[in-house]
Amino acid sequence: MLTDESLEFARQHIFWFYDTDFYPKPFEFKAIWHSWEEVKKYLISTPIQQLQTTNPKVLPWLKAKGGYRVVHQLEPLDALIYTALVYICAADIEQARMVPSVACSYRISPTDSSFFALGSGFPLYRNSCELLSSRHNYVLSTDISDFYNQIYLHRIANSIEAVSTIPKIGSTIESFLMRLNNKASQGIPVGPAASVVLAEAILIDIDQFITNNHVEHARYVDDIRIFSDSLEELEEILERLVIYLHDQHRLSLSGEKTSIRTTDEFLHEELQNQYQLEKLEILNDIEAGNPYEIYEEPEDADALDDAEDNTSEDELSQTLLDALVRAKNFGYVDLAVLRAIIRRAKSQKIPDLAELILTDIAFFRPVINDVALYLDSLPSAALLRLKKLFSSLCSDRKLESLSTRVWMEWLLTRHPDLLQEPAIRKYVYSGNTIAASSAAIIQKNQAWAKQAKQNLLSLASWNRRASIYSLSALSNNEKNKFISHIMQNPTMTATDKWVCKWVKDGCPELGLVDLHDIFG
């Protein structure tokens, strides 16, 4: 089922972008790229149902308006498989979708590495809503409750096989996701870009159903806006939609997000109110491109931004700082605005936002991934000036939420000067094995690596591989001898062995020459 083309796409997608939006990219991918031809041969020659899959890692992620959603990170090999499988049917799914003015979100246009070369589609959604509001008197606003977690996998298979020319691709994806879910038949991973494609597949017949009721609508993911000149007609359609979603998908609408308003009220309350106007003003001030891009921001995007920016650093720094203060004064987290500001600061390596963000780190938890990536982009001297603030945050337990810990551990273990601070070092080494291993490597902490050898084979997958990685802190003789020993153990998985080979070979990174050879 997996092909050379689909796996090459998955490789480039994960290399240039991310495996999930909510976790740092794991080091295991470096090991996989190091043995890529062997990995690819293994995945192509092994039937999908015989490939070992493991439940994803999960995090509670704070929503902008309170409450949590569960987000995921797949095992590295599972992430490759998932991306490759969805790539196989992505073009067929896009072909079956309604026109972009209706199904606005994430138009699927695969390139060599991206599912969504045309962007998120949010500006198109906004324009469609404004146009339809000018034509009609009323609008029904609604969205699907807990959408990703409520999707039935069998419905995904049916939706794909109804539109795809690839035999059994839908049932193959269903079976793969069932194994990821430990046989649960409901829910797709939150975070991977491939899940966005599957969500749009599910929504194909829902768009068709609304159109069959002879009304106009616009949809952005699971946010639906239906327009009519009749209040009564919208009430009837709402009832029909509730039944259709239940009967065909076992989905339900969010009561608190469902309303019927005049289009004038809708425009004023949702698109053209004072808050929205100020928000657009902020985005214009910082020259943000598309602030609604959640998935697929390339890791080399900074270079593109650098080439296009003619604003002086001091001017841009003050503009971004002012924008951040104004955004905080909204009184709640606006994900689009905060992401746009922080990503703009990251692209230009502007350090002046860092202290403001860190002193109110709890406010920024819904965008903690962007915060960490921004801080990591700063010059070493700028980070060093923040060492005491980081230390205080660690001592005062301000970085203990699970999502914050994942990203702050990743950040702090990339900067050895920060680890010289006792409170920071204690924070990192008292965390999970992955963080401690990363710290041991960057600090060349042989004692930690030697201890890690003692129970390495009894550890679960992520921690086992992290401990293998930490062996790079040891002498070549000790490292290679131990790796040769554990490679004979029958509990070692294929990914374990590729990590061993990578560590034994000195943990090489892909250089510019390698990239040219690989990607042309």
Regions found by a protein language model. Give the residues of each.
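Conserved two-metal-ion catalytic palm core of "right-hand" nucleic acid polymerases
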Residues: M1-P167, M178-P192
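Extended charged low-complexity segments that act as oligomerization/scaffolding linkers
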Residues: L180-N182, T263-E265, Q272
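Short secondary-structure transition/capping segments
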Residues: S230-L231, E265-L267
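Short, low-order "capping/linker" segments at domain edges
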Residues: L267-L280
